[in-house]
């Protein structure tokens, strides 16, 4: 069977090669921002162009391009789309039962102010879900809840994408950092510690920035005490846990500390002027619902948390290992014509080394986040006393609403894997290593590009981690800093990742309106990654002693 060795400068001039490699991304941007095409149309055009470039410019065999496309599409369906289907199904069950109205009233008993509700739900609760499950589920769940609480769909989706910036690096129990650390041979605690130091300021900024987007400086002034409590408690807990515990728990710990601290503070303080994004007058009549009904109303999300906690336990994961009790539920399909037949080339590997891509589609029927959410939905169905016929109707409605978002997600992941396996995405990253001492400024941009293309900080770190490390060594820079830059830069690209955009739009009923959401977030993402470039450069050249040394 033929082998394919990636080439990163197919035209013999790195900048010409970059220009060609950029074409699919530019087409995607133009499709959404200028031509206002639907997400699945933009994704299809981009993946089609990337496939043509992969074959004609990068000399990738057509069969390998086809397999890369199919693998990406399948990965988009399972586990990504399955997570979103399950999350929306859970939310819709709550609405169908009528208990969501009781939940809404209980939330509004904490505060009626939409600015603070976005912090509690989008930032605090969303960060907890990101720390536990990741994969877009937190955005879908929190955005849907905020719409139910009266915020507009576009607002809810956009603000939740921005709120999701702070916890992404430590998402899914720290996998983005631990996976990269293992791949590059650097202790995970060092990258975790440096990430916590840099994200301290990001985590402080994000809640205030969310309020600013909603209500300007007036909003910050009116809500400052509560937002400060949320931001500082989150940033402080994230800093301490990332520096002393490692990458696994900061996302969960910081979110819980912030959520509890803010909710307790709001028992004693409320903003004088209540802000409602829908322009309606703030009014709240204390409900006469029995406390048991309130507990039942919250039960879907309490059950979700409990199931997630179970799903991430080592003893539970061991059940799916070889010869484990539930190992039968794991299915593997290897793409024989590309698995271990696509090879990385220097400088992504050392000159005397060889690295290939194992391409195995893993269909984990039970051991996947989507199934944990779906199980929570089934248990919630019993607690909420939703009839089976109604639940089936809700599930069918969810699938119908998700048909175009599912197509979009599949095409986006196909685009990602065609770009990754052909070497197109690596060309973009490699060009930035030619910037010499300015590399520190562009280092976060590499992670940003990686997450834009793949939708995953983990994938970006695995894709570009070795490049960041080798470039740092050649430029005599602290490699922990550039590895951290890749991780943090990736978190800033999450809000414009086509995958994230598609998920958020699906959750709030804006399927086909991806261009509106993309325009809302792209400018902030670009500003943030530019600021991060300045921060990384300042650390590298002014205060390098704050970077943990590899012993």
Give names to the regions the model predicted.
Residues 95-100, 112-113, 146-155, 182-189, ...:
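Juxtamembrane helix-boundary/capping and inter-helix hinge elements in multi-pass membrane proteins
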Residues 137-145, 161, 174-185, 430, ...:
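Re-entrant/interfacial helical elements at transmembrane boundaries that shape
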Residues 20-29, 37-59, 81-87, 227, ...:
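Hydrophobic mid-bilayer segments of alpha-helices in multi-pass membrane transport proteins
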Residues 66-152, 385-471:
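Membrane-embedded alpha-helical segments and adjacent helix-loop junctions characteristic
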Residues 2, 169-279, 488-551:
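Juxtamembrane and boundary regions of transmembrane helices in multi-pass small-molecule transporters
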């Amino acid at each position: 069977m033929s082998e394919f060795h990636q080439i990163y400068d197919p035209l013999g001039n790195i900048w010409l090669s970059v220009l060609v490699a950029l074409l699919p991304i530019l087409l995607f941007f133009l499709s959404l921002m200028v031509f206002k095409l639907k997400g699945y149309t933009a994704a299809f055009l981009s993946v089609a162009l990337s496939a043509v470039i992969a074959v004609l410019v990068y000399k990738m065999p057509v069969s390998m391009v086809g397999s890369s496309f199919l693998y990406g599409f399948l990965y988009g369906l399972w586990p990504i789309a399955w997570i979103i289907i399950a999350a929306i199904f859970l939310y819709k069950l709550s609405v169908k039962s009528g208990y969501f109205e009781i939940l809404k009233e209980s939330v509004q008993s904490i505060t009626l102010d939409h600015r603070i509700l976005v912090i509690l739900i989008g930032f605090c609760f969303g960060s907890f879900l990101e720390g536990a499950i990741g994969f877009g589920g937190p955005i879908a769940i929190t955005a849907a809840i905020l719409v139910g609480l009266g915020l507009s769909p576009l607002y809810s989706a956009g603000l939740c994408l921005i709120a999701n910036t702070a916890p992404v690096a430590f998402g899914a129990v720290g996998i983005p950092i631990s996976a990269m650390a293992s791949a590059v041979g650097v202790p995970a605690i060092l990258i975790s510690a440096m990430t916590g130091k840099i994200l301290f300021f990001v985590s402080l900024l994000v809640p205030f920035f969310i309020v600013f987007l909603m209500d300007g400086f007036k909003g910050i002034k009116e809500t400052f005490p509560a937002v400060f409590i949320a931001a500082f408690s989150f940033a402080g807990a994230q800093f301490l846990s990332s520096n002393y515990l490692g990458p696994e728990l900061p996302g969960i710990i910081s979110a819980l500390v912030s959520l509890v601290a803010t909710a307790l503070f709001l028992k004693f303080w409320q903003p004088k002027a209540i802000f409602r994004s829908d322009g309606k007058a703030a009014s709240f009549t204390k409900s006469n619902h029995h406390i048991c009904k309130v507990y039942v109303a919250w039960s879907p999300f309490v059950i979700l948390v409990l199931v997630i906690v179970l799903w991430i336990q080592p003893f539970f994961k061991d059940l799916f290992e070889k010869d484990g009790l539930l190992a039968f539920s794991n299915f593997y399909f290897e793409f024989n014509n590309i698995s271990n037949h696509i090879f990385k080339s220097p400088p992504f590997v050392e000159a005397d080394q060889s690295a290939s891509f194992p391409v195995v589609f893993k269909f984990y029927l039970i051991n996947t986040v989507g199934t944990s959410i779906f199980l929570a939905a089934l248990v919630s169905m019993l607690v909420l006393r939703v009839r089976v016929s109604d639940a089936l109707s809700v599930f069918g409605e969810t699938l119908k609403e998700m048909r175009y978002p599912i197509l979009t997600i599949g095409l986006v992941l196909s685009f990602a894997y065609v770009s990754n396996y052909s070497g197109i995405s690596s060309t973009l990253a490699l060009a930035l290593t030619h910037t010499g001492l300015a590399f520190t400024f562009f280092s976060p941009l590499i992670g940003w590009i990686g997450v834009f293309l793949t939708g995953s900080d983990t994938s970006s770190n695995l894709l570009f981690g070795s490049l960041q490390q080798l470039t740092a060594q050649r430029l005599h820079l602290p490699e922990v800093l550039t590895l951290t830059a890749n991780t943090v830069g990736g978190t800033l690209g999450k809000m414009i990742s086509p995958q994230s955009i598609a998920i958020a739009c699906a959750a709030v009923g804006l399927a086909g309106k991806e261009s509106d959401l993309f325009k809302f977030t792209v400018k902030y993402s670009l500003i943030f990654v530019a600021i991060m470039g300045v921060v990384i450069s300042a650390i590298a050249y002014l205060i390098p002693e704050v970077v943990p040394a590899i012993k």
